[in-house]
Amino acid sequence: MSMLGVLRGPRQVLFGAGQRHALGTVTAALGSRALVCTDARFGGTREFADLVGLLEGAGVRVTVFAEVLPDVPVHQVAQCAAVSTEADPDVVVGMGGGSCIDLAKAVAVVLTHGGQASDYYGELRVPGPVIPVVALPTTAGTGSEVTPVAVLTDPERISKVGISSPHLIPHTALCDPELTLACPPALTASVGADALSHVIEAFTAVRRPVSAALATERVFVGKNELTDTFALLGVRLIAGSLHRAWSEPDDMQARESMMLGATAGGFALGSAGTAAAHAIQYPVGAVTHTPHGVGVGCLLPYVMEFNRPARVPELAALARAMGAPADATPDELADQAIDRVAELLASVGIPSTLAELGLPADKLRWTAEQAFGAERLVANNPRQLDVDTLEHIVRAAHAGDRSALRQSAAPDLTSTKGA
């Protein structure tokens, strides 16, 4: 097998307790007129006021858009851009969860290149560099602070849509785990499940044949040597800290490990991409109105079970990273990986079935059909997917029956796009 490594990320990442205090200096080096994107909750906190003070103290004029909604409705891109027109920002700062950072990235595209957000849906449709973005996450989950994608919700489409381009990667990510200490247990669990899904789906994604054009023709190239390194780091950190961060919110060591794990997951997914769990969650979330992380967390063990025949070595490596004994056989370790993931997610209150999430039984086939429309995610799965196989996964996840997905390895189960 020819080795391939593809890794994309910010110009700089500052990680650690207290790194938020560099915000003023970092931003002032990029511009003098900042548009700050955040949500109403964080925008009303003392921490937010202090951060704005850092910007102003560094001589940066600040315009605040504090109305970011979960899953970023696409109309908010135009709304935010209109609010900032008079201020003429030359740097955009996203403060908050992944939605706040995603909006900052999408607005930077529109402010730079004009048009509507919908003009840039898909991969590689952003024509050039954008206004620099500084990302300051307050949750340990999406990894958006280092990724080349902004995910939006468009009422004209059932599933979420993405703007994917290396130009969307923030210039600077300030990852301060102290900002996650106020994250309540339910949100810690949801975003933590999302982070776990990122490292696992990136590590088990399709491996495409190596070519000189691969990284220029795709944003998400599939698993490779560099993303694998970040994925394994992420799974080790998240597996060892998610439950503690959920049950002991003031445990700073757990919060640090979760944020570093989530950022590692962002690096992994930012070049490798995610797969079936994300494809299925989009229509599930549209129907049940449940958080993205809860949905992908619910689905993840079932997708791992389905992909097991094509990814035994990878699942074994994940099990070892999660602390499984190294002397077990690869098949035993693969089973342990799936069991350990399911147990960890259950321990922080993630529902184990789609029925618990509220997906109606008469929507199972429809869910599979909609998931199949997420072509990028479907193509990134290590086993080939069609509507019937997606429905098989959905039905198993609805009933809570992982055993329905168990099969032995067979050559024809792996994707023809590369194993």
Indicate residue ranges for each PLM-predicted region:
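ATP/NTP phosphate-donor binding region
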Residues: 1-91, 354
